[in-house]
């Protein structure tokens, strides 16, 4: 029998909701929760024959927690963003997914070397190297934002941070779901924001598309406009 435990401070309510929702959809894993006034523990168990599969899934789930939820908190605390906009969402998404492959590998290595999954403990101590790198990106973005004038400047900053790497995938969205046509898979849309279109932007930026098929006429004008700045848009309505 394989077992482990995820522990996390209860102030991270969105992170907890995400972890529990993902565990409900994970095959061959049973779990139980325990909580105190300040902390939650999620006890995990599975048969030994599925250990590698289950651990890989835990790494994937916790990678999203570290590299989307906690990274977003980190940047919002350091950037002069007083009112969110579509352009600012693109900027933050570019920052969240910058150097993502390297960071995901680092997360997996850190988790594999850990006795348990103490989320905030790992984030504050074992992953300090990541936070130092994020601090540098946040400093650059903050300086550029202070001198920005409107959404065009904000989007230019996002393009600068994302680098010159070209788009990799053709994707399609109906405003509720996203499919990566090139890789033939459904794209996960993580609920980072209360505004659903911001979550859509984050998932789209992560895919690095060169072409976006839009099949929903009900997307807002602001959303349509920002998609056209991210990649070539083809409307199929």
Where are these predicted regions, by residue range?
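C-terminal structured domains
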Residues: 181-237
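Conserved mixed alpha/beta catalytic, RNA-binding, or beta-rich assembly cores of soluble enzyme
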Residues: 1-204
């Amino acid at each position: 029998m394989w077992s482990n435990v995820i522990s996390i401070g209860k102030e991270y309510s969105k992170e907890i909701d995400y972890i529990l929702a993902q565990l409900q959809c994970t095959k061959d894993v049973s779990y139980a929760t325990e909580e105190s006034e300040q902390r939650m523990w999620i006890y995990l168990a599975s048969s030994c024959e599925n250990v590698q599969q289950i651990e890989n899934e835990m790494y994937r789930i916790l990678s999203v927690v570290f590299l989307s939820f906690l990274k977003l908190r980190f940047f919002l605390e350091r950037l002069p963003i007083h009112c969110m906009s579509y352009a600012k969402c693109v900027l933050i998404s570019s920052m969240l997914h910058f150097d993502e492959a390297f960071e995901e590998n680092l997360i997996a290595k850190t988790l594999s070397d850990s006795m348990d999954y103490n989320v905030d403990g790992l984030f504050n101590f074992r992953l300090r190297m990541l936070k130092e790198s994020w601090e540098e990106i946040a400093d650059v973005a903050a300086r550029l934002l202070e001198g920005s004038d409107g959404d065009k400047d904000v989007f230019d900053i996002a393009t600068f941070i994302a680098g010159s790497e070209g788009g990799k995938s053709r994707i399609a969205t109906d405003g509720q779901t996203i499919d990566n046509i090139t890789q033939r898979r459904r794209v996960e849309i993580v609920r980072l924001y209360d505004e659903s279109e911001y979550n859509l932007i984050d998932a789209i930026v992560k895919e690095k598309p060169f072409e976006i098929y839009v099949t929903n006429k009900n997307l807002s004008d602001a959303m349509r406009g920002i998609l056209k700045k991210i990649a070539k848009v083809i409307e199929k309505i």
